[in-house]
Amino acid sequence: MSRRYDDNPLMNHNHRKQGPSWKKIMGISLCIILAIVVAGGVLIYTIGHELISSTNFVADEDVKTVQEEELPEEAKETVSAEEKKGRVLDESELNEIHQQMNQLSDVDTVEDEDVYNLLLVGVDRRDKTWNGNSDSMMLVSINHTAKRVSVVSLMRDTYVDIPGYGYNKLNAAYALGGGPLLTETITDTYKVDVSRYAAVDFENMIQIIDALGGIDLEMTDAEVEVANGYMLDMCNTLGLNGYDYVLPGGGVYHCNGVQAVAYARNRYVGNSDYARTERQRYVISQIIEEVKRMDVAQLTQFVKDVLPLVTHNVEETEIWDLVTKAPEILQYKFVQDRIPYDNMYDVIYVDSQDMLVPQWETTIEKLHNTIYGDGSISDNSDNDAENKVEVSDEFTDDYPGLLDAETETEAGIVIQQ
């Protein structure tokens, strides 16, 4: 009986040996691709881990707390009775405010797994022997569901109950217990779940902006006058020639770190500290714009330069999550505001300090809507940076001779009495 060619075991075996099957080729190719991906992932993780490890991560339990009497004199900014702006309260009125604040304990803190809250802190200190006051506090909330990033400035003079210490200005919390105490105070006060913070002092902020290559800022004549005074003061502390940094007048400038930080610190032009918080948010927004323009190599170098300057308690897994989502987050809608909101607070004079007392129920409701709701907010910017320009006596006393009569007339400056 005859047998077909392909029925011959020997011939069939030789036929199969002519070359590898497409399945084997695909299998080998996939293994190679997988190996490359894994190797690349390991490399990226290793580089990323080294970068993240270079930051100044401080676990909450390692942050020391101090008593108020241990703080240096500069920690408390007192205001004389003659210069006060707040109402002097009798004991019953102050107790009523405390009772209203105590009722906040009945309000639930909002938690949402689709919202990430991070507190950005700008620290004011002349030496490293203490934590410093939190001169700038911005609550950054990333809402992945609404695809919105809200940046809300929390004014430093807000009257709050600091856990374990009692009633004081909000910025005193950082001086007493660093980032952990500040975030705890904000969580208890505003009923927003925030446990993570990232802090830089002014000297580090200067380095960050310089590493970025500077940022574009538009300033008025009056803002330049005041910023120049801050530049001279900071340069004196840093051992720099301040006159290499001062600006000639109002306009749009590509500012280096000293110039940008001096602009952000200004609370003497416009509506006092309200306008300053707007300037601080303006600086942050310009930093973000510069970061958006960077290519991969520039961004990598910037991250290497900046991370060691930041003190924070953000876990590495959270940083990786933010990094991987960064391209998407940068496309989100950005909104900004500040607390206290317009027409929703009072100013009182307590313990030789002017304090801001928000209408807490409506303030918390509005903040929660900004972060977790539809995000509809009323922009306070117009009221923060009014066209009228005011420069207080406090500034002219600190920097005599910077404001001459001609400049005062041209800029429309009103010296407060």
For the regions a language model picked out, list residue spans one by one:
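Extracytoplasmic
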Residues: E113-Y116, G132-M137, A146-L154, Y165-Y167, ...
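C-terminal solvent-exposed extensions
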Residues: S80-D108, D114-Y116, D127, I162, ...
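Entry/capping segment at the start of metal-dependent catalytic domains
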Residues: S2-N14, S21-A146, M355
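Sec-exported extracytoplasmic/periplasmic mature domains
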Residues: S141-H144, Y159, A175, T187-K191, ...
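Second-shell loop/turn segments in exported
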Residues: D124-T129, N168-L176, K191-R196, N266-A275, ...
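Extracytoplasmic/secreted envelope proteins and their assembly/folding machinery
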Residues: S134-S136, Y167, N171, G179-T187, ...
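Amphipathic, coiled-coil-like alpha-helical scaffolding segments used for oligomerization/assembly
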Residues: A172-L240, N313-E315, I319
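Flexible, polar/acidic helix-loop-strand segments at domain edges
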Residues: D210-Q298
